[in-house]
Curated annotation (Swiss-Prot):
Subcellular location: Nucleus
Function description: TFIIIC mediates tRNA and 5S RNA gene activation by binding to intragenic promoter elements. Upstream of the transcription start site, TFIIIC assembles the initiation complex TFIIIB-TFIIIC-tDNA, which is sufficient for RNA polymerase III recruitment and function. Part of the tauB domain of TFIIIC that binds boxB DNA promoter sites of tRNA and similar genes. Cooperates with sfc3 in DNA binding. Localizes to chromatin insulator sequence without recruiting RNA polymerase III and plays a role in nuclear organization.
GO cellular component, one term: nucleus
Keywords: DNA-binding, Nucleus, Repeat, Transcription, Transcription regulation, WD repeat
WD repeats: 221-262, 268-314, 326-369
Comp. bias intervals (Polar residues): 63-87
A single GO molecular function term of this UniProt record: tDNA binding
Organism: Schizosaccharomyces pombe (strain 972 / ATCC 24843)
Annotated transmembrane regions: none
UniProt-recorded name of the protein: Transcription factor tau subunit sfc6
Region (Disordered): 1-97
PANTHER family: GENERAL TRANSCRIPTION FACTOR 3C POLYPEPTIDE 2, RNA POLYMERASE III TRANSCRIPTION INITIATION FACTOR COMPLEX SUBUNIT
Taxonomic lineage from the root: Eukaryota, Fungi, Dikarya, Ascomycota, Taphrinomycotina
Acidic residues compositional bias, start-end: 18-39
Length: 582
């Protein structure tokens, strides 16, 4: 059933691999001096300083430096600390930290001070922190009012589905090394019975999941919308073809962090669900959960008014509140546009022909605000740089370019940020780091500076990176790939220490599949590790274990909950902040 993996049953047995490192020597200064921002001369122009050899052989006594001996030493700082080898190492490391800080936060004093505070708070965490780390965090409680005037949606409730129901089957899943058990469709299973410190659920949804999205809310009850493809298959239709058919969107409810159940199911005839995204505001109406943007394989974007308590469990959506599409292209992705001031009523979409379109839902015009060429091929992702740069947007496409543009003038203020040798399937914006998290060469997760000055490696895999997720409450990046593994990484461990410091990769779980036995095995309890230095090979994994989407919960008090959707139909939601550790 796949390669054996090293496991640990007790999460409290985690150890920090860098306990023996001299990390305490690298301390960021509060104010940068002129010496800190000077560029050092190459090491070959410096005068070599003799040091004491720490070997069993006969020691060599080092001579103290004199003012005359320090002449011609290039641009080395002329301070008392620089007269010793240890002091010089500290100074060089400090400059490396300041350089990385400037690459991420720029030269503005306020941004630099904010970055220093965040680094000091988060740089010591190698795994997901406990719930106490999220206390004091604030969330955006903007109200959803402007979209409540829409009244074009038609819902049909029925007790018995007059159409065909999806043919779903039980999945044989073994958790850890226990014997396999049959998981029935839409029946949550608690895989952490033997470990009361952890909290989470595993569900057989019965559909090949492709998108998950948490509902923004300020209440204790959480809602999760999940959607998937039309059928279970290793191959799918071309993304440039319009396809339609009966599909469903499931809505799951999490109550008091202990009860997870299916609330209701929305049926539609729009084909495979490519993307689900809730409007990032809170509804003021008790009868409405929120507005859900849905991109399907028929090439259209729809906005659904999701009711809080429908009359029946099965609901068929005959017509949406808002439908947007083109005749000459397919809509491939979307994102809600959050303005600096005012309510949210605009949606930015990417198309299969490389065009971008901005649509105002409240506008009486039937055409978008702009429809401009931007990429040379299918646009796969559109991301807004919230909260510090709400006017900037990032896009990735099948032309292997990552571009950035200003929505206030997208025709002039746009430029390519990077060009990769392979398609970038996912990209996300980390506001705490003020940097871009994306995949490179299919297998690597990298940090790209918004200013285009540096790139740092976060994680490497044997499979293609499919999905990345960030949170506004913590800096941890969730990574999902075709190898069936979900990991989280703390990028602040790269900024808070020296150049040699690497970020620990914490494997949350690993899904394996046996074709011979037609059963799955889900492993967890892994110890955080450092990324491998050797070059990794690309493997072809069974399509059933591919993790198509990971999503952090963006609500206050639930920021540690992570949802993962897999191609075999398994949905896993887990509270990674349940264990208090550091």
């Amino acid at each position: 059933m796949g390669p054996k993996s090293k496991e640990y049953e007790n999460p409290s047995s985690y150890k920090n691999d860098e306990d023996n490192d001299d990390d305490g020597d690298f301390v960021l200064e509060n104010v940068m001096s002129e010496e800190d921002i000077e560029i050092e001369t190459p090491s070959r122009n410096r005068k070599r300083v003799s040091t004491t050899r720490r070997t069993p052989s006969k020691p060599i006594r080092s001579q103290p430096l004199t003012p005359s001996s320090s002449k011609g030493a290039g641009n080395e700082p002329k301070s008392q600390n620089s007269s010793t080898t240890r002091g010089s190492a500290k100074k060089q490391s400090s400059k490396g930290l300041e350089e990385k800080l400037i690459n991420s936060y720029g030269t503005h004093v306020e941004s630099l001070n904010k970055g220093r505070r965040l680094i000091e708070i988060w740089k010591y965490y190698e795994t997901a922190p406990g719930q106490s780390s999220f206390e004091g965090q604030t969330s955006s409680d903007s109200k959803l009012q402007t979209l409540l005037n829409l009244d074009g949606q038609q819902l049909l409730s029925y007790s018995e589905n007059p159409f065909y129901l999806f043919e779903v089957k039980n999945l044989s899943i073994s958790f850890h090394f226990e014997s396999p058990q049959q998981v029935e469709p839409c029946q949550p299973v608690n895989p952490f019975k033997e470990n009361p410190q952890k909290s989470g659920f595993v569900v057989n949804t019965g559909i090949p999941l492709s998108s998950v999205s948490w509902l923004p809310t300020n209440k204790e009850t959480q809602f999760l919308a999940v959607g998937g493809m039309l059928k279970f298959s290793e191959t799918t239709e071309s993304v440039f073809m319009r396809t339609s058919g009966r599909n469903q969107i499931q809505l799951w409810k999490l109550e008091n962090k202990t009860n997870f159940k299916s609330e209701f199911i929305l049926y539609h005839d729009w084909g495979s669900v490519l993307q689900l995204e809730w409007c990032p505001t809170i509804s003021v109406e008790d009868s409405i959960l929120g507005f859900l943007a849905v991109v399907c394989s028929d090439g259209k974007l729809r906005v659904l008014r999701v009711p809080r308590s429908p009359v029946k469990f099965h609901v068929f959506v005959e017509q949406a509140d808002f439908t947007f599409g083109f005749n000459d292209s397919l809509i491939s992705c979307c994102t809600w546009v959050s303005p600096e001031h005012g309510d949210i009523h605009q949606i930015l979409v990417g198309c299969s022909n490389g065009y971008l379109a901005l649509w105002d839902i409240l506008s009486s015009q039937e055409c978008p605000l702009f429809y401009i060429p931007y990429h040379d091929s299918y646009i796969h992702n559109v991301v807004q740089c919230l909260d510090d740069f709400p006017w900037l947007f990032l896009t990735t496409a099948f032309d292997c370019y990552t571009r950035i543009f200003d929505i206030r003038d997208p025709i002039i203020d746009n430029r390519p940020l990077s060009h990769k040798r392979d398609i970038c399937y996912t990209i996300t914006w980390n506001n705490m780091l003020q940097s871009i998290i994306s995949c490179s060469e299919s297998q690597s997760v990298v940090i790209e500076s918004l200013r285009g000055t540096s790139t740092q490696l976060l994680d490497e895999r044997n499979g293609s990176i499919i999905s990345l997720s960030n949170s506004k409450f913590h800096p941890f990046v969730a990574c999902a790939a075709s190898d069936g593994i979900v990991t989280i990484v703390n990028p602040f461990r790269l900024l808070g220490f020296s150049h040699k410091q690497k970020a620990n990769v914490h494997r949350i779980f690993q899904l394996e599949y046996s074709e011979k036995q037609d059963s799955y095995r889900m492993l967890d309890g892994f110890r955080p590790r450092l990324p491998k230095a050797k070059k990794l090979d690309m493997y072809i994994y069974p399509w059933q274990i591919q993790v198509n989407k990971v999503e952090w919960n963006g609500n206050k008090g639930y920021a540690g909950w992570l949802a993962s959707g897999m191609a075999c139909g398994i949905l896993r939601v887990e509270d990674l902040s349940a264990v208090e550790r550091r």
